[in-house]
Amino acid sequence: MSTSKLSHPTAQVLIAIILGISLGLYSRSPWGAGSFDPGTLGQVGMLLIRFLKALALPLIFFAVADAIVRTNLAEKSGLRFLLICLVNVSIASGIALTLINTLHPGTKWQGHIEELLKLVGSSSVAAHIAPEKTKLDWLQGLSGMFPQHLLEPIQTGNILATVILAALVGISVRSLSSTTDEQERRAVDLLASALTGGFLVFSRILHFAIRLAPVAILALVSQAVGKLGLGIFVDLSDYLLIVILGLTIQGLIYYPLAAFIGGGRSPLGFLRGASQAVWTGFAVNSSLATVPVTLKCLKEMNVDEQSARISVCGGTNFNNDGVVLYEVMTALFLGQAMGMALDLPQQLVIAGSSIIAAAGIAGVPEAGLVILPIVLANSGFSEAVIAAAIPLVSPIDWILARCRSAVNVLGDMLGATILSHWRRSG
């Protein structure tokens, strides 16, 4: 295999998984037992996960604020586009909730979570399920939206408060951009540039950190296999297939029907026109990197340029249905694995956290895995549970990430198609 092929992220992840499995099996073998502790490797892998978690909220803050300042949306088209995004993400959340509550893939994992909790130094699952926390206090939740100081949302990992603060900053800077005072205008331009610069800096740091993902995956896979054996992949197959099923329903059933109902296009014609962009998104694992191909396909589908740019370029922060569906299903899967009886309001809180987090992580490689610790923390999972959960999903996230990207690309194209049809219809 050539050096260029080995340097490809997919190849590196596959090699990391193979090496992780090998080390895990070696630690379980008679000649390897006691030679090293796979749990130590797992802790090394979690260092990167914690670092990604620390980067996620500042990135979300700058991404949301910068998007509000920089995105040029006409009022009517902007409201229409946001309505399309809201419907799409609600459908994605509904699909996730329906599949998880119907098929219950997490029930067979209850014993495995217990073992992994012991491996990370925690006593039992029961110690991490606090009955008093399972009851939602809406007044307390509302008060959490208003921090005591500006840095508190990022310090405490509060997604909703972070996004609200970012939105207020972005709206304020945007509203001041029309000032006629030259000195004020320079100050506003400086603030806008600072928001863009902050987003670019944290994005670059995150891209550097993502390059270490194969090392973290190797460590986490060796930890999981060393403790649970190869049976972990057999048991994970249910979770993998159900997430792929959810993404398939969203991408291949709902989107074509929505294109027919809202965009006046035949379902097969929509999928045929979008196929090149979707496969490109799957291959490169990024809806943002696929933008040129997506715009080309939309042009060939006779979607007007303004609608295409609003949905594909301006709406990057809002078209993340694949990520939202993945986050909701993963959090509920882990809840089932822990034996937690989550009622509908609690599940909706998880869905809301996923939607908010996904809005600020657009274009970031492995975005789903990056924001997963934040979503789990905001959904009431303890640090120990998060440390035990990440090794479960990381071995198969590389394939799910590509499926998520493909769905996100198709969601971008659906938004442009419907928006273009509405513009032509008046």
Model-derived features: positions:
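Membrane-interfacial loop-to-helix junctions in multi-pass transporters
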Residues: 52-53, 157-161, 207, 246, ...
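Transmembrane helix boundary and interhelical junction motifs in multipass membrane proteins
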Residues: 56, 213-216, 286-294, 324-329, ...
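Transmembrane alpha-helical segments and their short flanking loops
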Residues: 328-426
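Signature of multi-pass transmembrane helix bundles
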Residues: 3-10, 14, 21-25, 33, ...
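Hydrophobic transmembrane alpha-helical segments of multi-pass transport and channel proteins
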Residues: 51, 86-90, 94, 244, ...
